[in-house]
């Protein structure tokens, strides 16, 4: 499945750490109402069956809004819930192996941090790239921020959609203008917001200026 650039505009990545008074389902629905263009379920806490149940529920929700649904890292869950996409990091299964498992219909996203990693991901069948960290982030304390100019260099080197991730929020989002990214992937800026729907509307308006 070809990854459309517009899927990357406002890409929500879930994080159970931000689930407070609402359920994750309610949070994701608020984000969808606010205009997110892609949802990635990143789940490190649940056992396989609970993860699968959640994946089916959130995938059905995303279908109502005609928004593609990605699973982070777990290829088996992605296959079983018929997700539109699977996203893997540099430490996870290689994109070429993922492609063998999922076939041609599922989109594959790969996290990259350099031009070399980006070109290798494309060569191995990636449909889109997550590039970061764009800025310092509270979500992953040990993350390395990209060197100056690296985001633009990666975007210039590939011909598939690129989404920036890492430490992005309303105040710094437009600093990515001119880098060539197709959109932004956000965790705490969305799911840590008091009013997720309203926050997503503001973030999307900014992302559309990139």
Where in the sequence are the language-model features?
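Conserved N-terminal beta1-alpha1 strand-loop-helix module at the mouth
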Residues: 1-93, 100-128, 146, 153, ...
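A short acidic, helix-capping loop that chelates divalent metal ions and anchors anionic groups
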Residues: 41, 78, 135-141
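Glycine-rich, flexible loop/turn motifs
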Residues: 108, 131, 139-142, 186
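Glycine-rich beta-strand-to-loop/alpha-helix junction loops that act as flexible
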Residues: 131, 163-168, 184-188
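Asp-centered catalytic/switch region of ABC-type ATPase nucleotide-binding domains
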Residues: 181
């Amino acid at each position: 499945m070809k990854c459309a650039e517009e899927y990357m505009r406002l890409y929500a990545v879930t994080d159970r750490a931000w689930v407070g008074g609402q359920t994750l389902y309610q949070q994701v629905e608020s984000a969808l109402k606010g205009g997110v263009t892609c949802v990635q379920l990143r789940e490190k806490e649940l056992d396989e069956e609970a993860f699968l149940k959640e994946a089916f529920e959130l995938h059905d929700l995303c279908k109502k809004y005609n928004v593609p649904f990605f699973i982070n890292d777990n290829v088996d869950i992605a296959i079983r819930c018929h997700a539109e996409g699977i996203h893997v990091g540099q430490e996870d299964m290689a994109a070429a192996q993922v492609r063998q498992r999922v076939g041609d219909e599922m989109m594959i996203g790969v996290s990259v941090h350099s031009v070399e990693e980006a070109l290798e991901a494309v060569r191995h069948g990636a449909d889109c790239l997550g590039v970061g960290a764009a800025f310092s982030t509270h979500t992953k304390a040990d993350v390395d921020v990209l060197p100056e100019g690296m985001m633009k260099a990666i975007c210039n080197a590939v011909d598939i959609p690129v989404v920036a991730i890492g430490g992005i929020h309303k105040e710094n989002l437009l600093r990515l203008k001119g880098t060539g990214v197709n959109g932004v992937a956000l965790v705490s800026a969305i799911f840590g917001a008091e009013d997720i729907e309203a926050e997503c509307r503001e973030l999307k308006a900014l992302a559309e200026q990139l």
